Amino acid sequence: MNYYIADTHFGCTNKYEDRTLEHDKLIKENWNRVVRNNVDTVYILGDIGREGSNKDNEYLCEIISTLRGRKVLIQGNHEGMKDARLRQLFVEITPYKEIIDNYNGLNHRLVLSHFPILFWASQHKGSILLHGHTHMTDEQKFFKKSINDLNEFFKDKTLKGYTDCPPARAFNVGCMLPYMNYTPRTLKEILKSGE
């Protein structure tokens, strides 16, 4: 089973989002409740945590090593991944990835990026963008509005090459979103969220 989550920010405290280290404990508990070890794959769409100093890296290694599943990191704006101890905790580290995930007997092409992208690979052929980065900010509201505007634009039947294309679908998998509830989610859960 594949799971998706972004913006865990382990080791970061933040007054803006009222985030304390208790969030780390909550995410870890939720993660290990749903993810099976050595069976499930978790795609972490960036900003996994605070890295840099030796102390920060040790804390991050400690947390990540206790999380179940095979971990694939899609790099965000906070990942330098210079520390070999951190890198070895992931089966793959990449800035962008396209995969196929199955839900309800259908294969779905997914584009995984930390950053929201207005135009992504095969979006008008039904591919789905999963992203993070924008948390629950005005940037996220703007991006959702942009996707809605784009879908309205492509309803114009006079546009060449875009007739009968499905609407663009993009989902923010930031852990702090209410439907994510600090828990890695399956594609089924994400699609049913209506986010």
Predicted regions and their residues:
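Short amphipathic alpha-helical segments and helix-helix/interface helices
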Residues: 32, 60-65, 96, 160
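Active-site neighborhood of phospho(di)ester-bond hydrolases with catalytic His/Asp-centered motifs
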Residues: 5-6, 42-47, 71-77, 112-113, ...
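N-terminal active-site segment of His-dependent metallophosphoesterases
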Residues: 1-58, 166-169, 173-177, 195
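Metal-dependent catalytic neighborhoods of phosphoester/phosphodiester hydrolases
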Residues: 15-16, 46-66, 75, 80-92, ...
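Conserved beta-sheet core of the metallophosphoesterase superfamily
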Residues: 87-195
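A general structural motif
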Residues: 37-39, 68-70, 107, 125-126
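Catalytic metal-binding/acid-base residues of hydrolase active sites
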Residues: 9, 48-49, 77-80, 116-117, ...
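Polar/charged alpha-helical tracts
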Residues: 25, 29, 58, 62-66, ...
